[in-house]
Amino acid sequence: MSTQTAERFSRFADFYPFYLAEHSNRACRRLHFMGSLLVLIILGYALVSQKWVWLLAMPLVGYGFAWIGHFVLEKNRPATFQYPLYSFLGDWVMFKDMLTRRIPL
């Protein structure tokens, strides 16, 4: 597994290139995309059906897909462990960038 940098990021704009470098494997990015998409679907279902217990599945699905991508495909440690907030934001920015085809899906 690759080692994380000891660098601390004070701005998300500085963190995001590091985040993308940790997601160089296309299959890993696709797993992130699927996890994020399923999180949105679960959220929509919970809101429409008012079955709030489904909200508990959101972190399991979102992080589950992402972590499989990191440990199995990227062979690195998810940035979430060192940068939880920036990593969470990075997931959604990367999702948007894949939707808009700025990053290949």
What kind of feature is each model-predicted range?
Residues 31-45:
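Core segments of transmembrane alpha-helices
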Residues 61-74:
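Transmembrane alpha-helical segments that form the membrane-embedded catalytic/substrate-channel core
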Residues 21-32:
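Short, amphipathic, aromatic/basic-enriched membrane-interface segments that mark the entry/exit
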Residues 43-46, 69, 98:
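Structural signal for membrane-spanning alpha-helices in multi-pass inner-membrane proteins
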Residues 46-54:
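Transmembrane helix interruption/hinge and helix-loop junction motifs
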Residues 55-60:
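Hydrophobic alpha-helical transmembrane segments
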Residues 2-19, 75-105:
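Membrane-proximal soluble regions of multi-pass membrane proteins
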